Structure formats: C-alpha cells, structure tokens
Regions:
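Active-site helix/loop of acyl-thioester processing domains in fatty-acid/polyketide metabolism
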Residues: 1-39, 123-125, 131-152
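HotDog/MaoC-like acyl-thioester-processing domains
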Residues: 2-9, 21-105, 163, 172-191
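Sparse, context-dependent recognition of short Cys/His-centered cofactor- or disulfide-binding micro-motifs
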Residues: 11, 15-19, 93, 101, ...
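Acidic/His-leaning functional-site neighborhoods
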Residues: 110-181
Length: 191
C-alpha cells in the first residue's frame, strides 16, 4: 500500500474512537513509524487500537497496523491529545525564523478540509466551520507524500493551521518547520 492510502486508513480508524471521551482535546503530537518495505508491499493492512494511556494532561492513543502472516506491526501510529484546561490560556505564538530554503507546502482550500473530513468520517466541528482548521492527519499525509522514502515522521503542533493559509516549510538542519504569516504552525522530523 502506498503512503497516501495508509495514512487515510489510519485517519479513518481514528474516527472509530469514542469522540465524546476526547471532546475539546487537541492534537499536540503525532508519531508515525513504518517498516517501509513491508508496508509498501502489503495489499492490505489491518489497523487495531493499542492500549490508551492517560494522565492529568493528555491521552496517548496508539494505532497499530498489521499484515497477515507478520507477527509484529508494520506500522505504529501514536497521537497525543492534550486535554482541555479550565484555565484560559493565551496562545503563545512562535515567530518563524527567516529561512533561505523556504518553499510552498500547500494552501488547503475549505473543500479539501471538508473532503478529508468526509472521506475519513471525521465529524469534529473545528474542521467543518466556515473557517476550518486543517486536520493534523491531513498535514501529516501531505508531508509524507511530499517527502521521499519515509519510514518515520514525528509532528509537533504549535498552533492551528487554517484553510486558505499559504503554508510554507523549510528545513532548519534538524526539522522541517511549517509556518504561515511569520508564525510556526508545526515541526516535522522526517526519517
């Protein structure tokens, strides 16, 4: 299976979770690891939830991808959801540096965001408004497709990305930095 189809299958599996449990939480981090050769050669990957871990601040939700005849998972996907807080927190924006190697990442249309929600079954209202937030999984999928030879991606989200924002990214020597309008949206460590 190609990386596009695998990320879509994981996104669809995520929508099977009891969303009411995680209402108001937001994605802080995503880690995706694959046994690249095995995952690409597979005709079908079966996704299962791993053991959910929780503390006072977050949920850690694993999804494991299995191929028939192979004992260990060929993919491991972990999403860290940050629990909502009773305290009002002001968003601390992180200014993007000036990058000589900056290039366009993507400008997601509202229709792309709505379409991704429809295709995966995601009914989170923040992705369905007039000014929708771009799904973390959609950002992950776009980065994975744009990057050759991916076996691991770790994404840390800094602030929401919105439809119609001209997203740029640049390599800072360690991570790819996703930014728009002078502010960091996320960082991607890709191996």
């Amino acid at each position: 299976m190609n990386i596009y189809d695998r990320i879509m299958a994981i996104g669809t599996k995520m929508t099977e979770m009891d969303a009411s449990t995680y209402q108001g939480a937001f994605i802080g981090k995503i880690s995706y690891m694959a046994e690249k050769e095995q995952a690409e050669q597979a005709d079908n990957i079966s996704y299962q939830f791993g053991e959910v871990k929780e503390n006072a601040f977050m949920y850690i939700l694993p999804i494991l991808g299995y191929v028939e005849g192979i004992e260990n998972p060929v993919e491991k996907f972990t999403v860290t959801l940050v629990k909502p807080s009773d305290k009002e927190k002001e968003l601390k924006r992180v200014a993007a540096a000036s990058y000589e190697n900056a290039e366009p990442f993507h400008t997601f249309s509202k229709e792309e965001v709505y379409g991704f929600s429809k295709e995966t079954g995601d009914q989170n209202k923040i992705h369905l408004t007039e000014h929708p937030v771009v799904q973390g999984m959609l950002l992950l999928r776009t980065a994975a497709v744009q990057t050759a030879d991916v076996s691991r991606i770790d994404v840390k989200f800094v602030e929401p990305s919105y439809a119609e924002e001209a997203l740029m990214w640049a390599f800072d020597g360690r991570d790819y930095v996703l930014f728009a309008d002078g502010y960091v949206k996320a960082t991607f460590r890709i191996k």
